Amino acid sequence: MNPIFETYFTRFEAFEQQSQKPVDRNLGIIVTIPCYHEPDILQTLNCLWNCTMPSCHIEVIIVVNHSETADNSIKQFNQKTFEQLCEYSSAKSTGTISFLPLAAFNISKKQAGVGYARKLAMDEAVHRFAQIDNPEGVIVSCDADTIVDKNYFIEIETFYRNNPQCSAANIYFEHPLTGDLQQGQYQAIAQYELYLRYYVEQLKRIGFPYAFHTIGSCFSVRAKTYCRQGGMNKRQAGEDFYFLQKLFPAECFGEINITTVHPSSRQSDRVPFGTGTAIAELKQSRQELMTYSTESFNILQDFFVRSKSLQNASEQEIRDTYESLHPCLKKFLPSSDFEQKIIEIQHNTKTHEQFCKRFFRWFNGLQVYKFLNFSCGNGFQKIPIGTAAKELFDKTDMDIFSLLQFYRLRAKKENKE
């Protein structure tokens, strides 16, 4: 067995192998899908089955899961779903794509959730690649209510073949804005996606080096990289955010934007937060989604500029820099923490590039998010997403849908450059 697989299985809390199904020697991409009380899973699988196939073999691992405390109706629904998936696998698996349903039923209440199911699926993908000694194999994270473009597999394969230095990548996404749902629901999802894109654009503007989306249905990672970073966590929600925050500073991260993933626009209560929950809350409140003001981001921008100049600074210069920071940031970040961390970074780096990289490993995406929330209670109120998105690029004449289209086009253009 390749040492990187062996290390992962022995050092980290990896799940044991679930399936004894033979592995195709040409296996190159594995799509992993958590599935909980999901009525549209066959629509997602049919979409994957209808994609143009790449040169490598494809596997799709679906983990049907529920907690030991789930309602009997959900348990019965999931049991029926699993049986349907087994029948689907027998009928639809071919020489180019195969489906592998797994059942994770009656998980302990403490562990049950999408993180558990996603980790089980991704760990199984590692076991599959380990059997054919393919550490370069690509694990794709998807969701059970997601649709993808026909060139999905082709573009994933092409990206990793043409970018051997890249260890992981996001896949461009757009939520559906038309269809059979109520107009209010599409209004809500447009606000939510605009919120996500506004946030990333602000991160880019202020010089944060890891300005990427963190969406569970839209990322991919090489098997060796997944292992190197300790694998997925079992969080009941937000598992994608925390996993990707580990990847961004440690690996070469790219973006695949020639194909598109279409996450569901429906409301849901399956996880404590996320797309479905946000849509439900917006519909119920009938208010505009609120976001962080440009002023809050500007405080971070100034902080980053000042901190990046401290590679060779004396202790007094570090203290002086701290005193020059915005009062809100100083309230968030105690002087002793800042000084100790900068000195530690100085002692462990030799070049400015190393200094900056280590600095942003410390003040990472989670720290940014925490500060922005902190600032909202300390003088910087949130503002409506429509107002914020208009002000950032001076687009005062646009409605929510036009703004979202502008931000989408901008994201695609930036990713190409």
Regions found by a protein language model. Give the residues of each.
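Acidic donor-binding/catalytic loop of UDP-sugar-dependent glycosyltransferases
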Residues: 123, 133-137, 141-159
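Terminal low-complexity segments of carbohydrate-biosynthetic enzymes
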Residues: 1, 280-417
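Active-site-proximal specificity loops/subdomain of glycosyltransferases
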Residues: 71-136
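Acidic donor-binding loop at a coil-to-helix junction in glycosyltransferase catalytic cores
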Residues: 235-242
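Conserved donor NDP-sugar-binding/catalytic core segment of glycosyltransferases
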Residues: 150-189
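Catalytic donor-sugar/metal-binding loop of nucleotide-sugar-dependent glycosyltransferases
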Residues: 235, 247-262
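A recurrent flexible, glycine/aromatic-enriched loop bordering the glycosyltransferase active site
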Residues: 200-220
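Short, acidic, metal-binding catalytic loop of nucleotide-sugar glycosyltransferases
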Residues: 25, 46-59, 66-70, 77, ...
